[in-house]
Design a protein with these regions (language model features):
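Flexible mid-to-C-terminal extensions adjoining Fe-S/redox cofactors in radical SAM and related proteins
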Residues: 100-165
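Radical SAM enzyme [4Fe-4S]-AdoMet core and its adjacent flexible, acidic
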Residues: 1-99
């Protein structure tokens, strides 16, 4: 894992900055933090802007961010549900189970995925990654539905891992 790492000692959550080069190798990135016994992760996309306000070449693009999240999700959903906490995946499942987003930004109201997106509330640099988040939400939706339904039946979402084998 080449990205920066900051440890939040209060919550024991590792904040991992996902650099462009990390996003190109999502399976390696995932297996690296898994091998290091990291069990709680917040992913932070590396975003750097030039003087014109455009993303620099060192930044993660929306397309690459979406592919990265999907590949990471594939690793997680097949082997580590409830074993490794990835904040975005956990928050997405919570939204599928009924928690609501507060006040939405105007440009997010028409998005099919606004109820899931953590960035729909305020203007953030992450909003340049909307297409990547949308790709992830679209891809993960069938899996999230199954996990939601398992939870509603008072069963473990981990059962999905067996179903996917």
């Amino acid at each position: 894992m080449t990205g920066s790492q900051v440890i939040d000692a209060e919550e024991d959550r590792h904040k991992l900055v996902v650099e462009y080069k990390d996003a190109l190798q999502p399976a390696d990135f995932y297996h690296n933090f898994k091998q290091r016994s990291i069990r709680s992760v917040q992913l932070i996309p590396h975003l750097e802007f030039d003087d014109r306000g455009d993303l620099t070449a060192a930044s993660v693009t929306a397309e690459l961010w979406g592919k990265f999240l999907i590949a990471l999700f594939e690793c997680w959903v097949r082997a580590d549900i409830s074993r490794i906490s990835i904040e975005l995946f956990d928050a997405t499942l919570q939204k599928w189970c009924g928690s609501e987003n507060p006040q939405l930004r105007r440009d997010c109201q028409a998005c099919d995925w606004h109820r899931l997106c953590p960035h729909a509330r305020e203007e953030t640099p992450d909003s340049v990654l909307c297409a990547g988040y949308q790709a992830f939400y679209s891809y993960s939706a069938p899996h999230m539905r199954v996990m939601r339904d398992l939870i509603k039946q008072h069963r473990s979402p981990m059962e999905l891992m067996t179903m996917l084998r």
